């Protein structure tokens, strides 16, 4: 779980990093791109675990939600760093 948080936060930092006076993406654009990607991941996990036992379904969805929580941590870290 910690590895997922580090990867997502690092990816958000790469998208939000400043080169001179320009950014690769604004914080909002980077957040929207990543949110769309993780919405697809969560939907794929939902479909993949449909029809399996309830305990396996809950475990798979919990893992997907942990990645989304990592995404939120990444967005917040980029937002804080962009304000400094």
Curated annotation (Swiss-Prot):
GO cellular component labels: plasma membrane
Principal location listed in the UniProt entry: membrane
Top-rank taxon: Archaea
Location in the cell: Cell membrane
Membrane topology according to the record: Multi-pass membrane protein
Residues spanning the membrane: 4-20, 27-49, 59-81
Keywords: Cell membrane, Membrane, Transmembrane, Transmembrane helix
Protein name per UniProt: Uncharacterized protein AF_0149
Taxonomic source organism: Archaeoglobus fulgidus (strain ATCC 49558 / DSM 4304 / JCM 9628 / NBRC 100126 / VC-16)
């Amino acid at each position: 779980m910690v590895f997922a948080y580090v990867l997502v936060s690092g990816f958000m930092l790469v998208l939000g990093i400043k080169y001179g006076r320009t950014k690769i993406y604004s914080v909002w654009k980077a957040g929207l791109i990543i949110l769309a990607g993780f919405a697809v991941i969560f939907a794929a996990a939902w479909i993949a675990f449909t029809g399996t036992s309830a305990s396996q379904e809950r475990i798979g969805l919990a893992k997907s939600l942990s990645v989304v929580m990592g995404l939120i941590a990444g967005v917040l870290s980029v937002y804080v760093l962009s304000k400094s």
